[in-house]
Amino acid sequence: MKSLVLLVALLLWSSSVPAYPSITVSPDEEQNLNHYIQVLENLVLSVPPKEPGREKKSNSPKHVYSIASKGSKFKELITHGDTSTENDVLTNPISEETTTFPTGDFTPEIGMKKHMESTPFWSIKPNNVSIVLHAEEPYIEKEEPEPEPEPTARQTEAPRTLPVVTESSTSPYVTSYKSPVTTSDRSTGIEISTESEDVPQLSGETAIEKSKELTFGKHPESWNNDDILKKILDINSQVQQALLSDTSNPAYREDIEASKEHLKRSLALAAAAEHKLETMYKSQLLSPGQTSNKIDDIETVINMLCNSRSKLYEYLDIKYVPPEMREEAATVFNTLKNMCRSRRVTALLKVY
């Protein structure tokens, strides 16, 4: 914008100067004019060329004066008489001294045409655009936005698992130890969770049904407490042997500590389950002809009746008894009826 104002000022100033046969130019004026001409040449040469296909034809009078005509006006302003092809000569009539200075060609150099996408200035959108001024009209050079990197999916940290311990020849039922929460069984596909430290109670699902899930493919009647303890000891020894080489690795330190805590809980649960299983085997698997300690039998029966006293009315109702146990339940019910009718039992009950 400043260059256009300067150009107009120079044109007006040149038209107001009277045309005399000779012009006296001082050194300061000559230096200023040379400076202005050099600035205008740089401005003209710095304007990028426009594509031929994008040029608009216009008959308006503002395009009559070309750059060459403007250059000739400046040449008339500072030259007189004959001009040389190489240099312009300024002659001072008083001292007859000549001053030469090179004149620049006002024809802009045509460089390599740069391929660009231009849009009208009225369709500018609020995005990354830059305005490039041409010699005659402005147009918009749109910069292609850089492709944004595709958002990467958030990677969720996978839970750490302990190294898989394969079974050895000495323990045919041990499969693997994967995490401090669950243990998987290969033959039955059962996962036993040890997060809860509650021991099976008498109400609801009995411990006999729980023990069937812990058999790992072995028949529940042949699976005893010694086998359970031996199984736990085998797992313990295999875990210790598998983790001996990884104790120095800090990446496995957290898993090793979690495994130790899990093993402690497993041993505690095994001891509690052993005690419960002993009690349940004595109370429910005791046959009439089996020899056992009488004190233990009495304690077992009384504890069982005491713990289930709130649900005795349901146990005595035949509709709550499973079909496969109704024959045994009928025998128990008849025995209880006969006991209630017996005078001996009635006399014993009066004592309490």
Curated annotation (Swiss-Prot):
| Signal peptide from the UniProt entry | 1-19
Q: What does the entry's PTM section describe?
A: Glycosylated. In testis there are two predominant forms of 77- and 67-kDa and a form of 47-kDa, whereas in epididymal sperm from caput, corpus, and cauda there are two forms of 47- and 43-kDa. Testis forms contain complex carbohydrate residues. Epididymal sperm forms are N-glycosylated. Then undergoes significant glycosylation in the testis and that the majority of these glycoconjugates are removed by the time sperm reach the caput epididymis.
The entry's function note states: Involved in fertilization ability of sperm.
Q: Compositionally biased, Polar residues: which spans? A: 166-193
Keyword Signal found? yes
A single Gene Ontology CC term = acrosomal vesicle
Q: Where in the cell is it found?
A: Cytoplasmic vesicle, Secretory vesicle, Acrosome
- Domain of life here? Eukaryota
One GO biological process from the UniProt record? fusion of sperm to egg plasma membrane involved in single fertilization
Q: Write the lineage as a comma-separated list.
A: Eukaryota, Metazoa, Chordata, Craniata, Vertebrata
Keyword set, alphabetical order: Cytoplasmic vesicle, Developmental protein, Glycoprotein, Signal
Gene this chain is encoded by: SPESP1
Question: What is the name attached to this protein's record?
Answer: Sperm equatorial segment protein 1
Which family does the record assign?
Belongs to the SPESP1 family.
Q: Write out the ranges of the annotated region (Disordered).
A: 140-203
